[in-house]
């Protein structure tokens, strides 16, 4: 696999970019997660960043990538509406793994947003998308720009939802390379990795949560529910960071 030219690839239409990365992705599918991270560090341009929502299984990608690329900036987009357990989990993992945490927030506070727009998450898909644009997408775009990111690692997995089922290991999103080292891992592999390295699930895992985001748009899993139905009232799965 040869080195890739980000600028040249960004000039191509999306379909052509996918085709241009197809051969590389075929080779990356044969590597394990650690091998994919190592390949990216050898063949893709820096600066490198890792994003995390500090959700249920976040410790896996945080540990895996940080072990191979110590001190990599870890981007968290904080909406101000995370569970108290999430904030404590962030503190715990940041200390345990010695993370180089970079927290980004909307330019408007949560209280100001509610005064201006009301509770956007109660305003259907359109309201949720506006909320996500303000609190997730814009802060992430700002983070990528300020950190001069050219390669972005994330912990998405195909098993998590239909919207992620066909994602490749390597893509281009928001003008940068995006690498998903554990994209093909199943829940059993996640569990085994956590056990092997003495890591924990998010505290709310034990209370029946399969996915954790904001307090107002996260539900406990119930029998007959798909995992994606536990977020955004089942109206959508993605918060906007991993779309487009």
Curated annotation (Swiss-Prot):
It is an enzyme of class 1 (oxidoreductase). The active site is at 239 (nucleophile). Keywords: Cytoplasm, Oxidoreductase. It is found in: Cytoplasm. GO terms for molecular function: phosphoadenylyl-sulfate reductase (thioredoxin) activity. It comes from the Bacteria. NCBIfam families: cysH (TIGR00434), PAPS_reductase (TIGR02057), PRK02090.1 (NF002537). Belongs to the PAPS reductase family. CysH subfamily. This is Phosphoadenosine 5'-phosphosulfate reductase. It comes from Shigella dysenteriae serotype 1 (strain Sd197). The gene is cysH.
């Amino acid at each position: 696999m040869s080195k890739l030219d980000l600028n040249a690839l960004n000039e191509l239409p999306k379909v052509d970019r996918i085709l241009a990365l197809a051969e590389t992705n075929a080779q990356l599918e044969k590597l394990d997660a650690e091998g994919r991270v190592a390949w990216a560090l050898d063949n893709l341009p820096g600066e490198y960043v890792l994003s995390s929502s500090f959700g249920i299984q976040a410790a896996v990608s945080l540990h895996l990538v940080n072990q191979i690329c110590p001190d990599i900036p870890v981007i968290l987009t904080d909406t101000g509406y995370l569970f108290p357990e999430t904030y404590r989990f962030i503190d715990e993992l940041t200390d345990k793994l010695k993370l180089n945490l970079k927290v980004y927030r909307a330019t408007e506070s949560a209280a100001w947003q509610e005064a201006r727009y009301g509770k956007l998450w109660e305003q259907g898909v359109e309201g949720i998308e506006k909320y996500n644009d303000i609190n997730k997408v814009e802060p992430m775009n700002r983070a990528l720009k300020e950190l001069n990111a050219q390669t972005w690692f994330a912990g998405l997995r195909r098993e998590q939802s239909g919207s992620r089922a066909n994602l490749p290991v390597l893509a281009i999103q928001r003008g940068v390379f995006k690498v998903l080292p554990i994209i093909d891992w199943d829940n059993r592999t996640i569990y085994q990795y956590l056990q092997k390295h003495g890591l924990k699930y998010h505290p709310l895992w034990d209370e029946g949560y399969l996915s954790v985001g904001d307090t107002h748009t996260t539900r406990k899993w119930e029998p007959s529910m798909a995992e994606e139905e536990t977020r955004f009232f089942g109206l959508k799965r993605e918060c906007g960071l991993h779309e487009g």
